[in-house]
Amino acid sequence: MKYNREEFEEVIVNIGRVTKVVKGGRKFRFTALVVVGNRKGLVGYGFGKSKEVPDAIKKAVDDAFKNIIDVKLNGSTIAHDIEVKYNASKILLKPASEGTGVIAGGSVRPVLELVGIKDILTKSLGSNNSSNVVRATIKALSMLKN
């Protein structure tokens, strides 16, 4: 499905540098994890790799637009509690009353803010690997029922 890219915001969650040691020295490559969302229920994440940081970010954004999901919101929060595990990362999402704000840490916050959720309580358990935490959060949001 084609989306109007001007409506979406991008947040770079993580940029990593990978080193390969070869006979002639070290070769660096970069990875980028990007989350895109329109604050109206659509969100996606993407992963890009390249020899240069801007190229890795561009690839990650393109990948994010291929992985967009539609999240069912209940006003400014979610409809029910949900707990999801992705690899060693575990995410707990709880609906919150209006005015609470987004209480989330690390890589969970950009995903929830770009979806358009304004009031939610979260807890990240287990591994805090940003890639797995983002994937667990997206998985949890896709499993929500209204």
From Swiss-Prot:
The keyword NADP does not apply. It holds the Pfam family Ribosomal_S5. Residues 8-71 form the S5 DRBM domain. SUPFAM superfamilies: dsRNA-binding domain-like (SSF54768), Ribosomal protein S5 domain 2-like (SSF54211). With S4 and S12 plays an important role in translational accuracy. Belongs to the universal ribosomal protein uS5 family. NCBIfam families: rpsE_bact. The N-terminal domain interacts with the head of the 30S subunit; the C-terminal domain interacts with the body and contacts protein S4. The interaction surface between S4 and S5 is involved in control of translational fidelity. Part of the 30S ribosomal subunit. Contacts proteins S4 and S8. This is Small ribosomal subunit protein uS5. It comes from Campylobacter hominis (strain ATCC BAA-381 / DSM 21671 / CCUG 45161 / LMG 19568 / NCTC 13146 / CH001A). The gene is rpsE.
